[in-house]
Amino acid sequence: MYTVMLDLKGRSVLVVGGGTIATRRIKGFLQEGAAITVVAPTVSAEINEWEAKGQLRVKRKKVGEEDLLNVFFIVVATNDQAVNKFVKQHIKNDQLVNMASSFSDGNIQIPAQFSRGRLSLAISTDGASPLLTKRIKEDLSSNYDESYTQYTQFLYECRVLIHRLNVSKSRKHELLTEIIDDQYRLSLVKQREFLQQIEKYK
């Protein structure tokens, strides 16, 4: 498996199923600004709320071939083997498909993941052990705490500024290397001092 990150903003996403797994997947898709359609006879209370707010569309029925047309990303989150088989038989080769109940039946896996601002971390054991995946996620989320939210934004702003400086490539590299020292994550004062230092190069 090759790990990539998808930009789902404005992209069509079809979620087949309306239970716990579907709800969890949808929550992430909403954060990414996807255009979501849910197809399921019944859906969770959260999905009902999102529909009421106009955040997604719900078709309360069994999935049909017409629902799969012109969809960028399909997530099948149901334990109904007949539904899973139907979707597998009718998808197109160029569609991205995640089968929650059987990784091998789709061409996309959705790893455990979390974000701290511009920092995104994803963990997968390729289906070997969801429990180990969960443990590693908990360990990483503890090590990479909320301080990284502000820190990664600082790094991004500095990178933009440094690349605009009229200095040598080696000096730019030195500056970029300097700010990944943990002292900058832990001190807003150090961050301000560095930005003031950058101003002197202009």
Curated annotation (Swiss-Prot):
It holds the Pfam family Sirohm_synth_M. The keyword NAD applies. Its EC number is 1.3.1.76. Pathway: Cofactor biosynthesis; adenosylcobalamin biosynthesis; sirohydrochlorin from precorrin-2: step 1/1; Porphyrin-containing compound metabolism; siroheme biosynthesis; sirohydrochlorin from precorrin-2: step 1/1. This is Precorrin-2 dehydrogenase. Keywords: Cobalamin biosynthesis, NAD, Oxidoreductase, Porphyrin biosynthesis. It comes from the Bacteria. The keyword Repressor does not apply. GO terms for biological process: cobalamin biosynthetic process; siroheme biosynthetic process. Belongs to the precorrin-2 dehydrogenase / sirohydrochlorin ferrochelatase family. It is an enzyme of class 1 (oxidoreductase). Changing S101D: 2.8-fold increase in the dehydrogenase activity. One of its GO terms (molecular function) is precorrin-2 dehydrogenase activity. It catalyses: precorrin-2 + NAD(+) = sirohydrochlorin + NADH + 2 H(+). Catalyzes the dehydrogenation of precorrin-2 to form sirohydrochlorin which is used as a precursor in both siroheme biosynthesis and in the anaerobic branch of adenosylcobalamin biosynthesis. It is unable to oxidize precorrin-3.
